[in-house]
UniProtKB/Swiss-Prot annotation:
The chain crosses the membrane at residues 16-36, 52-72, 78-98, 101-121, 125-145, 164-184, 186-206, 237-257. Pathway: Phospholipid metabolism; CDP-diacylglycerol biosynthesis; CDP-diacylglycerol from sn-glycerol 3-phosphate: step 3/3. It comes from the Bacteria. This is Phosphatidate cytidylyltransferase. The gene is cdsA. It is a multi-pass membrane protein. It comes from Helicobacter pylori (strain J99 / ATCC 700824) (Campylobacter pylori J99). Keywords: Cell inner membrane, Cell membrane, Lipid biosynthesis, Lipid metabolism, Membrane, Nucleotidyltransferase, Phospholipid biosynthesis, Phospholipid metabolism, Transferase, Transmembrane, Transmembrane helix.
């Protein structure tokens, strides 16, 4: 009983600290600060992913990680750096034959998600990150309480504690709340913001499921222990990473569509 109470207390304290830190970073709205902090988090998440994919850590892995993250700061398209890092790692595997083929996987997950998260901030600003946070948090909260109150149908064997009803409630709540924040970022109004928020929330659900699948596959409860009461970095950011990639893709293609429309109009 005492252990459970301590865990819950730790969970709430850690949650408050994370919210305050995230709020301060977004308030500062400084690209270098955001890049540096997110880079440190990425390094921890990458280490956790090595465990989940059962890949042995090596100098070449972390060298590629650092160089690609530095390149992302100067590159106009950060997500490209994630894909290039995966290609470089594949080349190292082929040349050295010192790594198993699974060594490429941490550069895809969580790698692509972290680069997308940085890309969302770099290309679209702090408001887009706030939008993403609102959608992901609302999806998690809605799924948790919706599942507790109305959940009856198991969602998937990958995560047996989640229910279909909870997932649907979470997605609906995230779509509605996210649309009000997204309206400030989109010129298409409420309906476009609602559609984007729905797609982000949907991907966030599958981000959580994928993390659950990886942990279940290797027989661990949490991806790490760095966050008291929460587990590891990936336990907290799994939904965010999938959501970030979907948001970045949606906003990126929206920009292309606008530019094309202007070009054709001229």
């Amino acid at each position: 009983m005492k252990e459970e109470l301590f865990k819950e207390k730790s969970r709430y304290i850690t949650g408050v600290v994370l919210i305050v830190v995230a709020g301060l970073i977004l308030y500062a709205d400084n690209l270098l600060l955001f890049w540096a902090v997110l880079g440190g988090i990425y390094a921890v998440g990458f280490f956790e992913a090595l465990r989940l994919f059962q890949v042995k850590a090596s100098f070449s892995l972390y060298l590629i990680l650092v160089l690609s993250w530095v390149a992302a700061y100067f590159n106009g398209h950060p997500v490209e750096c994630a894909l290039i890092s995966a290609m470089v790692m594949a080349s190292v595997i082929a040349y050295q034959k010192a790594h198993h083929s699974e060594a490429i996987l941490p550069f895809l997950y969580p790698g692509v998600g972290f680069f997308a998260l940085f890309g969302v901030y770099k290309d679209f600003g702090a408001v887009a990150i706030i939008w993403l946070l609102v959608v992901v948090v609302a999806s998690d909260v809605g799924a948790f309480f919706g599942g507790k109150l109305l959940g009856k149908t198991p969602f998937t064997a990958t995560s047996p504690n989640k229910t279909l009803e909870g997932a649907l409630i979470g997605v609906v709540l995230a779509s509605v709340l996210g649309s009000f924040v997204g309206m400030g970022k989109l010129s298409g109004g409420f309906l476009m913001a609602l559609l984007f928020s729905f797609l982000i929330a949907l991907m966030a659900v599958f981000g959580d499921l994928y993390e659950s699948y990886l942990k279940r596959k290797v027989g661990v409860k949490d991806s790490g222990k760095i966050l008291p009461g929460h587990g590891g970095v990936l336990d907290r950011l799994d939904s965010m990473l999938f959501g970030a990639l979907s948001l970045h893709v949606l906003l990126y293609f929206l920009e292309i569509w606008k530019e094309t429309a202007v070009f054709l109009g001229d």
